[in-house]
């Protein structure tokens, strides 16, 4: 027994030394890599059943990925992994991100992952890619999001056909726009937020009008054009159609705003089709790399990723979740809200942005300065990547920008970048 005890003690001593050495070796490793945005590209955003409706999300994703790689000016085989957000995946076939990646001409050996965090999917893809690059798992990655809401199918339950027939369900509503906990539409959650923060319909309509006018001004000034990867649509027996401008922001009649009926709450409702985002098609992609890779490849980055964070609240309060993610960013970066030159808060509904402005106490003039999803459109898997990419283009050198987006289920994601 004494011999056995001595042997056990020796083993414990050896294990303790090994653990100590492991900790010491780990602690001596280099710090996290800095991650930069080398390029950002997106397709135009198409209206529901509009100009891009003939193309699946995966094709739109391919166009955005290819443009991001080309604009970074690097060989396609330098991209070692791809993350793409996509929410409404039914009927697209296996592994949508893989389809988009190979369709963009990237190497067959490129691993891919499809991310679904509802409306935050595109942004979460950027965050996950940044983590992988920071940790040194990869040196060059593409991240973004894609959605073709025009091509989302209907479904019916499997099983014996019941008496009276079967019920078809719209998967846009079922998988994209319904709070599964409270069994209500996202718009009802928006109405709850409007009531909680005393935000009137008039305020929401006014915000929506500003969104449209800002989007038009940004397009008219040429500010958005450099983000766009044109989409070519082949026509049988006719010239190809080349789509190179957002479709939604031009489809508006301001005189109808005050006359529209509320959609989700009949009595004392505030949310209408005019002050909400629309159903849309589009894709966005960012090429991310470490600064070491940027130096090796002679790439001049657009911006660097400073910090990112998620937050979660009660599912019905999902519209205000970004206000809980943003303080985490500022704390991590050692910045104050006054240091932020540009805010992009996704306009799922006008009330989302108005409520977050109130909660964060930020200057409305710095929020969605060039329009947002109410006017440009909201392809739900794309939008999070779009607003990060837009900031990377629109900020001026040395400025900081924060992009935040809410997602169904009570979540939000946010990213802080600095223009280089």
UniProtKB/Swiss-Prot annotation:
GO terms for biological process: fatty acid beta-oxidation. Residues 1-33 form a transit peptide. GO terms for cellular component: mitochondrion. The active site is at 119 (acyl-thioester intermediate), 406 (proton donor/acceptor). Its EC number is 2.3.1.9. K(+) binds at residues 212, 273-274, 374. Its main location: mitochondrion. One of its GO terms (molecular function) is metal ion binding. CoA binds at residues 212, 251-253, 256, 277. It catalyses: 2 acetyl-CoA = acetoacetyl-CoA + CoA; propanoyl-CoA + acetyl-CoA = 2-methyl-3-oxobutanoyl-CoA + CoA. Pfam families: Thiolase_C, Thiolase_N. Keywords: Acyltransferase, Fatty acid metabolism, Lipid metabolism, Metal-binding, Mitochondrion, Potassium, Transferase, Transit peptide. It is an enzyme of class 2 (transferase). The record marks 378 as: Increases nucleophilicity of active site Cys. Pathway: Lipid metabolism; fatty acid beta-oxidation. It is found in: Mitochondrion. PANTHER family: ACETYL-COA ACETYLTRANSFERASE, MITOCHONDRIAL (PTHR18919:SF156), ACETYL-COA C-ACYLTRANSFERASE (PTHR18919). Belongs to the thiolase-like superfamily. Thiolase family. This is one of the enzymes that catalyzes the last step of the mitochondrial beta-oxidation pathway, an aerobic process breaking down fatty acids into acetyl-CoA. Using free coenzyme A/CoA, catalyzes the thiolytic cleavage of medium- to long-chain 3-oxoacyl-CoAs into acetyl-CoA and a fatty acyl-CoA shortened by two carbon atoms. The activity of the enzyme is reversible and it can also catalyze the condensation of two acetyl-CoA molecules into acetoacetyl-CoA. Thereby, it plays a major role in ketone body metabolism. Homotetramer. This is Acetyl-CoA acetyltransferase A, mitochondrial. It comes from Xenopus laevis.
């Amino acid at each position: 027994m004494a011999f056995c005890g001595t042997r056990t003690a020796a083993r414990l001593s050896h294990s303790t030394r090994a653990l100590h050495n492991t900790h010491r070796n780990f602690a001596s490793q280099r710090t996290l890599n800095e991650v930069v945005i080398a390029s950002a590209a997106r397709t135009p955003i198409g209206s529901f059943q509009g100009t891009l409706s003939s193309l699946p999300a995966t094709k739109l994703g391919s166009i955005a990925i290819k443009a991001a790689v080309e604009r970074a000016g690097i060989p396609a085989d330098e991209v070692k992994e791809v993350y793409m957000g996509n929410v409404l995946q039914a009927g697209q076939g296996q592994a949508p991100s893989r389809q988009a990646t190979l369709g963009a001409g990237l190497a067959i050996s490129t691993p891919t992952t499809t991310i679904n965090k509802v409306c935050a999917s595109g942004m979460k893809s950027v965050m996950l890619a940044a983590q992988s690059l920071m940790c040194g798992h990869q040196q060059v990655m593409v991240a973004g999001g894609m959605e073709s809401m025009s091509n989302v199918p209907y479904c019916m339950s499997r099983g014996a056909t019941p008496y009276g027939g079967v019920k078809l369900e719209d998967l846009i509503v079922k998988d994209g726009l319904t709070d599964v906990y409270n069994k209500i539409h996202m718009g009802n959650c928006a109405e709850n937020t409007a009531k909680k923060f005393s935000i009137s319909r008039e305020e929401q309509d006014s915000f929506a009008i500003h969104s449209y006018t800002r989007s038009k001004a940004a397009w008219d000034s040429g500010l958005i054009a450099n983000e766009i990867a044109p989409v070519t649509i082949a026509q049988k027996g006719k010239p190809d159609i080349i789509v190179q401008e957002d479709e939604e922001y031009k489809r508006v009649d301001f005189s109808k705003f005050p006359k529209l009926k509320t959609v989700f709450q009949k009595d004392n409702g505030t949310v209408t089709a005019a002050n909400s985002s629309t159903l849309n098609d589009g894709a966005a992609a960012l090429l991310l790399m470490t600064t070491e890779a940027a130096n090796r490849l002679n790439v001049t980055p657009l911006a660097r990723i400073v910090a990112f964070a998620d937050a979660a609240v009660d599912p019905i309060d999902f519209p205000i979740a970004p206000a809980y993610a943003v303080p985490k960013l500022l704390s991590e970066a050692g910045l104050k809200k006054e240091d932020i030159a540009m805010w992009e808060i996704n306009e799922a509904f006008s009330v989302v942005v108005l409520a977050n402005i109130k909660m964060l106490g930020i200057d409305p003039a710095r929020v969605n300065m060039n329009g947002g999803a109410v006017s440009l459109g909201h392809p739900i898997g794309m939008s999070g990547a779009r607003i990060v990419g837009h900031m990377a283009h629109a900020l001026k050198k040395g400025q900081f920008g924060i992009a935040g987006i809410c997602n169904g289920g009570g979540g939000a994601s946010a990213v802080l970048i600095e223009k280089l």
